Amino acid sequence: FYPKFGFLPAAEAQIFSPSSPQQPIPLRRINPDNPKDRALLIQSYRRSNPFSAFSMENNEGLLLFYALGPFRHFLYTPPEENAVAILEEDGDTLFCHELLGEWSGSLFQTLNRLTQPRIRKIGLGFTPKDTLPGQIWQSGEDHLFVLGKKENPFAARKLFFPLISHA
């Protein structure tokens, strides 16, 4: 369907890295129905993901779609409450869909402070700026299309379009 409008399929891959749980950050689950928590989520979104190679901007509507729907129970904030993590556990894997706002330390340190001892690997819902130790790329199941007449950033290197920007 999309190719007849000039769009071409682009290969997308997701990063997975082994976990090394460290002293965990205590997290509080946030409730997107609570006005204070929703404001924190939006403020953190506006500060973006400091670890991401690229991110979605000016699309609070899509963020709220995920926050009020499929990711409702995966929203967490650290004690400082100046950031939001969208985290989902599946067996021994922690999916870090997004890290929004202000986080201290490197991505590797932050991820491993968000994991519990039972977690063996971490999957990212975004493309990190920096390489993670032991990272591997796995082909995604989603279908991504780019406009054929424009530059295709997915052709030159492996990327994962931020999960919370998938429409």
List each language-model region with its residue ranges.
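Short sequence/structural segments immediately N-terminal
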Residues: Y2
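Active-site/acyl-donor-binding loops of N-acyltransferases
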Residues: F5-I25, E98-G101, N112-A167
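Amide-forming acyltransferase catalytic core, primarily the GNAT-like/NAT-type
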Residues: F7-H97
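N-terminal charged segments
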Residues: R38-P79, G105, T127-A167
